[in-house]
């Protein structure tokens, strides 16, 4: 092999190694910043009721559901708050330290992002409340439809519309 080809081969190999290292670092960075979305039922039972697809303790996840009435516990000396979130199935406990959104209240839909510190306890770094009574995050809406359709619950049941509201609409 002549010297010219050797130098070209070295340059090509150097570029390939550099691109490979850069790609590996990008993939590693993306992997550590991806937060998977779960419903409380999926945290407890695993996605599609498959225990092998449960999130692991220490994993960063996002959980969406409704704040269980009567479950909000506030520490009077700090900004620590603890509350339960559920869909139709089991609940999980969310622990958060900070100022909650103005729209946060019991019975309200929320999305909490954080780290799972126990199989059913999420240490939240961020809590988001939905902005009006009919809004459901797209991911939560899809998950709720998957969970509720087999149970025979209609989409109107998921909107939170009462029987009285439905009767008033029908009478108009």
UniProtKB/Swiss-Prot annotation:
Residues 161-172 have a biased composition (Basic and acidic residues). One of its GO terms (cellular component) is plasma membrane. Pfam families: CcmE (PF03100). GO terms for molecular function: heme binding; metal ion binding. It comes from the Bacteria. It is found in: Cell inner membrane. Residues 141-172 are annotated as: Disordered. The keyword Heme applies. GO terms for biological process: cytochrome complex assembly. Heme chaperone required for the biogenesis of c-type cytochromes. Transiently binds heme delivered by CcmC and transfers the heme to apo-cytochromes in a process facilitated by CcmF and CcmH. This is Cytochrome c-type biogenesis protein CcmE. It comes from Actinobacillus succinogenes (strain ATCC 55618 / DSM 22257 / CCUG 43843 / 130Z).
């Amino acid at each position: 092999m002549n010297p010219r080809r050797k130098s070209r081969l070295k340059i090509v190999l150097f570029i390939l190694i550099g691109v490979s290292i850069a790609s590996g670092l990008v993939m590693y960075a993306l992997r550590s910043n991806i937060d998977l979305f779960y419903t409380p039922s999926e945290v407890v039972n695993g996605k599609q009721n498959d225990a092998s697809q449960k999130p692991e303790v220490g994993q960063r996840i996002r959980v969406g559901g409704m704040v269980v009435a009567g479950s909000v516990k506030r520490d009077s000396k700090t900004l620590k708050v603890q509350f339960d979130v559920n869909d139709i199935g089991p609940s999980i406990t969310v622990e958060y330290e900070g100022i909650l959104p103005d729209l946060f209240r019991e019975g309200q839909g929320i999305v909490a992002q954080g780290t799972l510190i126990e199989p059913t306890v999420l240490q939240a770094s961020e809590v988001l409340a939905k902005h009006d009574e009919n809004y459901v995050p797209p991911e939560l809406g899809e998950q709720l439809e998957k969970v509720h359709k087999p149970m025979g619950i209609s989409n109107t049941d998921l909107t939170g519309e009462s029987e009285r509201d439905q009767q008033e609409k029908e009478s108009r």
